C-alpha cells in the first residue's frame, strides 16, 4: 500500500471502495447489455431466416413412400419401368444459427432451395457439416438449432432427403453430442413417423462405430438396382478433440465389416447378383489425397493411375483434409465389386 493510501481517512477509504464497486458494476452491466444485444440480434436473424424458409414454395416428390426396415437399418425406394432415380448430392451447408452468421445462413438457405428447385431430385443426400457451431464464426454453440433449421428447410421443400454427419455437426464444445443429434434426426424421420416425414435416417447398428450408418436401396420390377450406403466418417482423433491440429478420424474397421455384410445381404436378396452401389460420407479417404496430389503434380493432367473423368476443381491449391490413418474401406470396395462411386 502506498503512502498516500495509508494517510486516507476511514471515510475516504469507504468512498474509494464504493467507487471501485460502481465502476465494476458499470463494466459488468455493460457486458450483460452487450451479450443481451447479441442474443437479441441472433434471435431476430434466426427468426428472419426461418420466415424465409416458411415463404418457400414446395418442390414435392413423385416417388412412392419408401419402406423402412428397422432390423437392418435400411430404407427401400421402389420405382418401375424405365424410371430412373435422380439424386442431388450436397455437402457443407454450414448453417451457423448465430448472430455472426445471419447473412451466410440466408445465402445457404437460398442456395439449397435454388438447387432443389432447378434439379427437382427424387432424393437429396447431404454428406455432413449441415451445422457449423463454431462460436467465433457463428456466434453460438447450439448445434441442434442449426440442424433443426435445415430440417425445416427440407421439410418445406418437400423432397426426400438423407444425411450423414461431418466433423462440424457435433463439435466437442457444442451443446449436443453426436448421439443426441442423431436421436433428434431419427425421431423426426420417416422411420418414426416424425414431422420431417421425408427424412430417411437411421443411427444404425449400436455395436459399430458412428451414429449414422444405414442403407437406402432402390428396387425396380422386384430386383435391386442400386444401393446407397450412408456412413459416419466420425470427426477427430482422440488426441485432437477440438480439431485444432486437423487430425481427422476415418471409417473404422467395424464399419467396413458392416458395409461388406450389407453388400452381401443385398446380393443374396437379389438372387446372388451383385447390386451396384454408391457410398456417401464426409471425411475423404486417404486415397483421395494420394490421387489428387499425383494429379496435381502432373500439371493437373491424367496419369497412369489417376483419371479425371468429370467435374471441375474450383480450388486448384486446395488440399484434401483426410485422416492420417488408412481405412480398409477402399480395399473392400475393390474386392467386393459393388460400389461404383464414393461421395464426400
Q: Over which residues does each language-model region extend?
A:
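Active-site environment of divalent metal-dependent phosphoester hydrolases
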Residues: 96-99, 132-135, 163-175, 236-239, ...
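Hydrophobic membrane-insertion alpha-helices, especially the h-region
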Residues: 25-41
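Active-site-proximal beta-strand elements of phosphoester/diester hydrolases
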Residues: 84-97, 225-235, 280
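Extended active-site neighborhood of metal-dependent phosphoesterases/phosphodiesterases
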Residues: 51-77, 145-272
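Divalent metal-coordination and catalytic microenvironments
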Residues: 92, 112, 124, 129, ...
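N-terminal Lys/Arg-rich, disordered targeting/topogenic segments
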Residues: 1-22
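His/acidic metal-ligating clusters that form di-metal
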Residues: 119-122, 227-230, 242-344
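N-terminal active-site segment of His-dependent metallophosphoesterases
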Residues: 43-144, 149
Amino acid at each position: 500500500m502506498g503512502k498516500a493510501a495509508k494517510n486516507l481517512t476511514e471515510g475516504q477509504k469507504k468512498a474509494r471502495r464504493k467507487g471501485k464497486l460502481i465502476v465494476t458494476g458499470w463494466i459488468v452491466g455493460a457486458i450483460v447489455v452487450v451479450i443481451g444485444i447479441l442474443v437479441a440480434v441472433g434471435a431476430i436473424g434466426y427468426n428472419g431466416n426461418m420466415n424465409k424458409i416458411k415463404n418457400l414454395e414446395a418442390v414435392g416428390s413423385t416417388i412412392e413412400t419408401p419402406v423402412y426396415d428397422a432390423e437392418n437399418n435400411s430404407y427401400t425406394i421402389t420405382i418401375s419401368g424405365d424410371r430412373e432415380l435422380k439424386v442431388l448430392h450436397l455437402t457443407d451447408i454450414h448453417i451457423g444459427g448465430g448472430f455472426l452468421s445471419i447473412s451466410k445462413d440466408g445465402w445457404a438457405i437460398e442456395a439449397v432451395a435454388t438447387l432443389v428447385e432447378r434439379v427437382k431430385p427424387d432424393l437429396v443426400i447431404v454428406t455432413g457439416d449441415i451445422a457449423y457451431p463454431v462460436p467465433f464464426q457463428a456466434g453460438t454453440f447450439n448445434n441442434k438449432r442449426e440442424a433443426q433449421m435445415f430440417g425445416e428447410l427440407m421439410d418445406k421443400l418437400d423432397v426426400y432427403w438423407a444425411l450423414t454427419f461431418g466433423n462440424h455437426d457435433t463439435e466437442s464444445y457444442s451443446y449436443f453430442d453426436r448421439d443426441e443429434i442423431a436421436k433428434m434426426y431419427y425421431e423426426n424421420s420417416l422411420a418414426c413417423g416424425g414431422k420431417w416425414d421425408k427424412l430417411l435416417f437411421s443411427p444404425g447398428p449400436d455395436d459399430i462405430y458412428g451414429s449414422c450408418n444405414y442403407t437406402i436401396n432402390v428396387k425396380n420390377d422386384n430386383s435391386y438396382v442400386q444401393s446407397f450406403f450412408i456412413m459416419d466418417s466420425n470427426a477427430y482423433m482422440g488426441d485432437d478433440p477440438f480439431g485444432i491440429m486437423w487430425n481427422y478420424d476415418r471409417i473404422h474397421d467395424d464399419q467396413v465389416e458392416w458395409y461388406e455384410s450389407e453388400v452381401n445381404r443385398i446380393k443374396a436378396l437379389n438372387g446372388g447378383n451383385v447390386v451396384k452401389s454408391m457410398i456417401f460420407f464426409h471425411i475423404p479417404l486417404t486415397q483421395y489425397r494420394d490421387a489428387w496430389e499425383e494429379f496435381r503434380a502432373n500439371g493437373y493432367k491424367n496419369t497412369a493411375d489417376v483419371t479425371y473423368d468429370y467435374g471441375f476443381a474450383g480450388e486448384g491449391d486446395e488440399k484434401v483434409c483426410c485422416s492420417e490413418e488408412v481405412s480398409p474401406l477402399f480395399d473392400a470396395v475393390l474386392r467386393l465389386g459393388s460400389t461404383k462411386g464414393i461421395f464426400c
